Design a protein with these regions (language model features):
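Hydrophobic packing and interface segments
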Residues: 2-421, 426
Length: 427
């Protein structure tokens, strides 16, 4: 149990490191020049609008979270496999998800005009400011995720014990409330923010092009501010909450399934804690990866981003191998059959490279100057009808390869783990 607590504290330390790095990046962004008065004025208007939306949304969500927490606590009170304290997990999950979105959007609205000003003199500096703003969102998501999960796991494991299967089952059931809280916020933030974004976008089009005869993004069009507010609300706060929910859900799901693996006739808690350890290690590697992102003047920013992404991925392969070799036994039992733990490593690596592959495919179908994007642009020359048809066709085509990658990843993970539960580590 002492070893378990030490591992949890290390996991929480990684979360604290992520938050400290985020605050450092935020401080650096605040020190950058905001540009001329016009840039500062527009940036301030966008920031004010984004925060006004978020305040209104969070006021409504507060009522929802309190009501659902009460229902969850009442429904789980007196149960042998759960507890009313699941409502605490739910509330903390909702708070963490909301906070991740708030921090990300706060920094994004500060980085907007600073990136514009930096781009006047240097592409490399503009990328640095923009990427720093994005890294705050990403590291806030993972930092709050492992902090919340690690803190609650430490609390519940000491409250209910973590020595037998029934205690572990209860702790994980209660912990799942954290994921439910995150999912609840993600639903409202993503859908609500997305609807606002599209409404503002179409409104800007109608007002500008139809009524006033001015471009959509012209500063004289008041709907332009609302459109940019929507971009921050939907694509930063909403996306952040969505990623937080997916991140937390995949970790908890792996922990629950890992609890059923037997070693020497009993449960091995290392299979339960492994997903959190991998996530915590990923935070440290991701921070290192931010220093790999760079671009020369006149270079391609996407190549600079790919450097950090694939560099981090390669480092993570070695980290995962060391973790699995150090903390997992050489063999485990599932369904009465013995298997080798190296299968867990292969399943995890397959999932890692599957994700990187999907990212590259997405870049191919949406990146600047790529063949699919150029084909859509060429169709625009003959009218909106052909443009819509081409865009729809490319969009449908773009789903094929990711589906193949996902299917191949599942089959590959299954082949190495022989259709046992460690296959789930490929997430």
């Amino acid at each position: 149990m002492d070893n378990m607590n030490n591992n949890i504290l290390l996991i929480m330390l990684a979360g604290i490191l992520a938050m400290l790095f985020s605050f450092w990046k935020t401080s650096w962004i605040n020190k950058q020049s905001q540009g001329n008065d016009r840039m500062e004025s527009i940036g301030s208007s966008i920031a004010d609008g984004a925060m006004a939306f978020l305040r209104a949304e969070y006021r409504i969500l507060t009522v929802f979270v309190i009501a659902v927490a009460f229902i969850l606590g009442y429904a789980n009170s007196g149960r042998s496999d759960s507890s009313a304290i699941i409502s605490l997990s739910f509330v903390i999950g909702a708070l963490a998800s909301g906070l991740a979105g708030f921090l990300g959007m706060k920094v994004a609205t500060k980085a907007n005009n600073r990136t514009t000003h930096a781009a006047e003199s240097s592409l490399a500096r503009a990328l640095n400011v923009a990427f720093s703003g994005g890294s705050v969102m990403g590291l806030s998501v993972v930092g709050l995720g492992v902090l919340g999960l690690g803190g609650l796991l430490y609390l519940y494991s000491n409250m209910y014990g973590f020595e037998n299967s029934s205690a572990v089952s209860m702790v994980l059931n209660i912990l799942s409330g954290f994921s439910l809280g995150a999912s609840s916020i993600a639903l409202f933030a993503r859908v609500g923010g997305g609807i606002y974004t599209k409404a503002a976008d179409v409104g800007a089009d109608l007002v500008g092009k139809v009524e006033a005869g001015i471009p959509e993004d012209h500063p004289l069009n008041p709907a332009t501010i609302a459109d940019n507010v929507g971009d921050n609300v939907g694509d930063v706060a909403g996306m952040g909450a969505d990623l937080f929910e997916s991140y937390v859900g995949s970790i908890i799901g792996s922990m629950v399934l890992g609890s059923s693996i037997l070693v020497a006739g009993g449960m091995d808690l290392n299979f339960v804690i492994l997903p959190l350890l991998i996530a915590a290690s990923g935070i440290v590697v991701s921070i290192l990866g931010t220093f790999m992102v760079s671009v020369k003047e006149g270079g391609d920013p996407q190549k600079g981003l790919n450097q950090g992404e694939f560099g981090s991925g390669l480092i993570m392969v070695g980290v995962i191998y060391v973790l699995i070799v150090k903390i997992l036994p050489e063999s485990y039992f599932q369904g009465g059959v013995s298997y080798n733990s190296t299968g867990v490593f292969y399943a995890t690596i397959i999932g890692l490279f599957g994700g990187l592959g999907i990212g590259k495919i997405t870049e191919h179908y949406t990146g600047t100057g790529t063949k699919p994007v150029k084909s859509i642009a060429e169709q625009s020359m003959t009218g909106p009808a052909t443009n819509i048809i081409a865009g729809l066709g490319v969009g449908m085509e773009s789903t094929a390869v990711p589906m193949i990658i996902i299917s191949a990843s599942i089959m590959g993970a299954v082949s190495y783990t022989h259709l046992t539960l460690p296959t789930i580590y490929s997430v």
